[in-house]
């Protein structure tokens, strides 16, 4: 047998350039790139070394023979001419893989059968012994590739694909293959950073593939050191002594690497179900002293190495499979960029994405981009230096716009620099006092309109100190204070949401219409908001699902803040906006009590309470609602704040869901509708009639020491007396109503319920 062999190293598409550098470094000679492969010449020692040390190859194929072929008979005889007795025993096992087509072979299964027949016929003994097929663990795995009329017959030295290192027995929903992860790390400069003693953090680590591959690179561990079964183990050309020598060298290098002070390598994962599988993978790789995995959200990501060293932040954000829609992904990327800018200054970052356009939403420029393929999906690796001069603020402006801004700044003699942001005790930004607005002549109001404007301004003044102190962004400024102006007016940052209550039949419709027009003329002036930002709806008594039906179809969402969280409201499309303002104190209470708890939100609507619970450090949140529309909205709210996988969203009838639920929760919030008769429900829900069954089912899921909060806005609601006989029930309505709803004490009622 020759001292030098032709080798083919296969790899994922896009890794050829990296693989040829690695292979040449390991001893491959006359190396050339091919599509998804590298070809070269090597000794048996180099072939073994490539099997052991290649972080990027899928397979190491040793070419046994090349021969021309025009038809199936040429294929059969070409394989038959090989001295197979030099490669395997007559009673051994084999598997055959065939790729390519042409020369009369248009079916790979047929081609594989012809190769198998030739090998079996060559080795069949007079006694009837012959090789058998074992597709899973054969003694030899033979590969034949048909390329433009030439057959390339090879022995697969690797056996199973080399990306299967043996440590990742548990994986998440959309894992990266280990060799692709290694390639991304190499392209990201991790070998250089590790050699300098730098740190590595993955804010979306899943089951830790990036972490383990990074640890093996840093500790000089051969990626396939722990593999026990190889494609050459039963090959008659195998040289055990040579293999043993190379394997022992790799063991010694790994021992020396692991004896060094471990680098700071940390992973954070939102989904609690992936934490232990990730830790198990790290332990199987022998890197428990180097790598730690914690539960954590992107929204709270902040790497803090022991010695304050900088390093590499690397991650593979979901492409849509895990989060569901593009809007959620947009918020995720925005949060990632925000955390990089705020918590990772002077670090390097590498973001591997199947949605490169979303990478632009991070607000940081990438200085290099590399193309990769994750299976059949084209992807980009964005390399980022987290430095202030790379931050992108605001929208892109033309040179003319920038010049106009400079001229305006010079004219005003005001430095064009951002002011330092200040925050109130609830974590909301305190808005700077705006410059005086230019004086614009306003249309003259009617007597009734002026009276209404005066009332609005009086209410604003009365609430101004409370609004400023609490950092309230959305609040009610008027709620039918004057009977002749029957409407509710809510401020949503710089928008106004007006709900006209349907006038009783005793009121002259013409007079009601005049008053409405007077009010609409007064609102922009009194609240100092452009009339284009005033949204008006009529609120009537709702029945069935009418309260959830679309009023319009603009699909415009506005972002508001409350208690340090960001929420999306839609002021146009539905009667309600996605945020029940009267429940603000309840949401703040939940945020304060949620730390470390399992939170359940029933009839969750847009899951604003779940967002507050996640902000407060809830161990997990589960939100249940019958409406897919509102659950999609809820997903956006969670993603907007960087909360994702550990926050479950369940579509279903709450009563049926509770009957099938077997989990326990420490904190439960129930805010049911007064009435519901959706087609997706088995029956009709009536809060007065069904309250006992609902609360009993929920209390059965309440953990020891847990708290259930029950609230509803049915004005005639009466809590059943027998509930207080079984549970500790305390009405807390007064503490759940803020000053903006103090004029309407019946806006809702709320109770705290615990086990006796």
Swiss-Prot record:
Gene3D superfamilies with a match to the protein in the record = 3.30.2130.30, RNA methyltransferase domain (HRMD) like (3.30.750.80), Vaccinia Virus protein VP39 (3.40.50.150)
Does this UniProt record's set of keywords contain S-adenosyl-L-methionine?
Answer: yes
Domain of life the protein comes from: Bacteria
Give the catalysed reaction(s), semicolon-separated: guanosine(2445) in 23S rRNA + S-adenosyl-L-methionine = N(2)-methylguanosine(2445) in 23S rRNA + S-adenosyl-L-homocysteine + H(+); guanosine(2069) in 23S rRNA + S-adenosyl-L-methionine = N(2)-methylguanosine(2069) in 23S rRNA + S-adenosyl-L-homocysteine + H(+)
Q: Which SMART domains match?
A: THUMP (SM00981)
Enzyme superclass (EC) = transferase
Specify where it is mainly localized.
cytoplasm
What are the entry keywords?
Answer: Cytoplasm, Methyltransferase, RNA-binding, rRNA processing, S-adenosyl-L-methionine, Transferase
Which residue ranges does the record annotate as region Disordered? 395-441
Q: Which HAMAP family match?
A: 23SrRNA_methyltr_KL
Q: Which organism is it from?
A: Pseudomonas fluorescens (strain Pf0-1)
Q: Which PANTHER family match?
A: RIBOSOMAL RNA LARGE SUBUNIT METHYLTRANSFERASE K/L, RIBOSOMAL RNA LARGE SUBUNIT METHYLTRANSFERASE K_L
Compartments (UniProt record): Cytoplasm
Task: List, for all copies, the residue spans of the domain called THUMP.
Answer: 46-157
Enzyme Commission no: 2.1.1.173, 2.1.1.264
Lineage of the species this protein comes from = Bacteria, Pseudomonadati, Pseudomonadota, Gammaproteobacteria, Pseudomonadales
Care to name a GO molecular-function term for this sequence? Answer: RNA binding
Report the coiled-coil segments: none
Could you name the Gene Ontology cellular component terms for this entry? cytoplasm
State where composition is biased (Basic and acidic residues).
395-409
> Which one Pfam family would you cite for this protein?
Methyltrans_SAM
What this protein is called in its record is Ribosomal RNA large subunit methyltransferase K/L
């Amino acid at each position: 047998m020759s001292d030098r062999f032709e080798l083919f190293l296969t790899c994922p598409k896009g890794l050829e350039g990296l693989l040829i550098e690695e292979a040449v470094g390991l001893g491959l000679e006359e190396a050339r790139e091919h599509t998804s492969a590298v070809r070269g010449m090597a000794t048996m020692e180099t072939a073994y070394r490539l099997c052991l040390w290649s972080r990027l190859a899928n397979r190491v194929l040793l070419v046994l023979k090349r021969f021309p072929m025009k038809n199936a008979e040429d294929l059969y005889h070409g394989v038959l001419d090989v001295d197979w007795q030099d490669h395997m025993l007559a009673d051994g096992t084999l598997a055959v893989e065939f790729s390519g087509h042409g020369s009369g072979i248009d079916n790979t299964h047929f081609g594989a059968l012809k190769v198998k027949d030739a090998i079996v016929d060559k080795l069949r003994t007079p006694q009837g012994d012959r090789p058998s097929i074992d597709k899973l663990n054969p003694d030899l795995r033979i590969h034949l590739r048909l390329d433009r009329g030439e057959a390339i017959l090879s022995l697969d030295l690797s056996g199973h694909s080399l990306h299967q290192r043996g440590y990742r027995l548990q994986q998440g929903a959309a894992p990266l293959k280990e060799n692709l992860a290694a390639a991304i790390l190499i392209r990201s400069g991790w070998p250089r950073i590790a050699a300098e003693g730098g740190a590595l953090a993955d804010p979306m680590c899943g089951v830790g593939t990036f972490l383990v591959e990074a640890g093996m690179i840093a500790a000089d561990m051969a990626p396939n050191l722990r593999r026990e079964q190889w494609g050459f183990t039963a090959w008659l050309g195998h040289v055990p002594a040579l293999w043993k020598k190379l394997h022992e060298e790799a063991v010694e290098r790994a021992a020396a690497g692991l004896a060094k002070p471990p680098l700071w390598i940390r992973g954070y994962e939102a989904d609690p179900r992936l934490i232990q599988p990730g830790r198990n993978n790290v332990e199987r790789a022998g890197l428990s002293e180097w790598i730690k995995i914690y539960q954590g959200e992107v929204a709270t990501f902040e790497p803090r190495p022991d010695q304050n060293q900088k390093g590499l932040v690397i991650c593979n954000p979901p492409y849509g499979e895990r989060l569901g829609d593009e809007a959620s992904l947009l918020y995720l990327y925005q949060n990632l960029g925000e955390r990089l800018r705020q918590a990772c200054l002077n670090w390097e970052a590498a973001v591997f994405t199947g949605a490169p356009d979303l990478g632009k939403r991070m607000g940081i420029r990438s200085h290099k981009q590399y193309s990769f393929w994750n299976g059949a999906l084209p992807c980009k690796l964005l390399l980022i230096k987290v430095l202030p001069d790379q931050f992108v603020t605001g929208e892109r402006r033309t040179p003319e716009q920038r010049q106009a801004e400079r001229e305006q700044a010079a004219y005003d003699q005001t430095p064009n620099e951002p002011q330092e942001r200040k925050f109130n005790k609830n974590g909301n930004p305190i808005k700077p006092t705006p410059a005086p607005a230019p004086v614009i002549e306003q249309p003259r109001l009617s007597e009734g309109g002026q009276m209404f404007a005066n009332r609005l301004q009086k209410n604003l003044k009365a609430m101004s100190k409370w609004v400023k102190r609490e950092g309230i962004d959305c609040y009610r400024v008027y709620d039918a204070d004057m009977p002749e102006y029957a409407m509710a007016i809510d401020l949503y940052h710089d928008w106004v949401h007006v709900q006209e209550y349907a006038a009783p039949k005793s009121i002259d419709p013409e007079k009601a219409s005049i008053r409405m027009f007077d009010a609409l003329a007064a609102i922009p002036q009194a609240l100092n908001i452009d009339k284009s930002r005033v949204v008006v709806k009529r609120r009537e008594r709702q029945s069935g699902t009418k309260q959830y039906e679309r009023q319009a179809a603009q699909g415009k969402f506005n972002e508001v803040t409350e208690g340090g969280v960001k929420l999306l409201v839609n002021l146009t499309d539905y009667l309600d906006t996605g945020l029940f303002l009267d429940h603000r104190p309840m949401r703040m209470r939940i945020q304060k009590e949620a730390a470390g708890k399992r939170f359940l939100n029933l009839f969750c609507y847009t899951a604003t309470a779940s967002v507050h619970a996640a902000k407060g450090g809830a161990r997990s949140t589960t939100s249940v609602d019958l409406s897919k529309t509102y659950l999609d909205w809820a997903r956006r709210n969670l993603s907007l704040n960087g909360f994702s996988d550990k926050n479950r969203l369940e579509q279903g009838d709450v009563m049926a869901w509770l009957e099938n639920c077997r989990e326990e929760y420490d904190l439960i919030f129930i805010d049911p509708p007064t009435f519901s008769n959706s087609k997706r429900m088995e029956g009709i829900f009536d809060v007065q009639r069904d309250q006992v069954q609902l609360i009993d089912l929920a209390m059965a899921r309440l953990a020891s020491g847990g708290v259930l909060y029950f609230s509803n806005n049915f004005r005639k609601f009466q809590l059943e007396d027998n509930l207080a006989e079984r549970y500790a029930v305390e009405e807390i309505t007064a503490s759940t109503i803020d000053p903006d709803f103090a004029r309407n004490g019946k806006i809702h009622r709320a109770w705290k319920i615990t086990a006796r």
